[in-house]
């Protein structure tokens, strides 16, 4: 047994430069995953559900011209675990409806048994993955 046990990831806060567009994007996407908006302010929006939470925060003014760079120090991408392939496919269908930028998928990969995923971007280009894997953690 490990010395310290954790019980999942409590939350992730994403700092965005296009707050209005990001708020609209996440307020339409996250409820599809069963997440409920519990805070919605001028500079911060926070959804809870699925044993985690996702928040978005307006960036400081001096960073408003910047965009997400996947290979810069910091977040590479955010990945949410689906319960079934159908959920990954439903995510794809919804993303098409809202005209989100889909990077790739849904498709299978050999990274892990049963790995099936879709990768897409929010309005700031932050990459989000929804996946299914037969490896249960």
Regions found by a protein language model. Name each.
Residues 2-3, 48-83, 89-98:
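Long, continuous compositionally biased terminal/linker segments
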Residues 129-130:
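Short glycine-/small-residue motifs
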Residues 135-137:
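Conserved small/polar residues in nucleotide/adenosyl-binding loops
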């Amino acid at each position: 047994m490990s010395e310290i046990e954790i019980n999942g990831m409590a939350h992730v806060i994403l700092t965005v430069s296009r707050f209005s567009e990001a708020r609209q994007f996440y307020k339409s996407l996250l409820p599809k995953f069963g997440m409920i908006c519990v805070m919605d302010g001028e500079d911060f929006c926070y959804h809870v559900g699925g044993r985690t939470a996702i928040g978005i925060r307006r960036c400081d003014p001096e960073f408003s011209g910047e965009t997400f760079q996947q290979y810069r120090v910091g977040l590479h991408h955010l990945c949410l675990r689906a319960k079934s392939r159908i959920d990954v496919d439903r995510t794809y269908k919804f993303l098409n409806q809202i005209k989100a930028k889909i990077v790739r998928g849904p498709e299978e990969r050999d990274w892990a048994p049963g790995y099936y995923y879709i990768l897409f971007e929010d309005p700031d280009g932050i990459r989000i993955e929804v996946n299914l894997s037969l490896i249960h953690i």
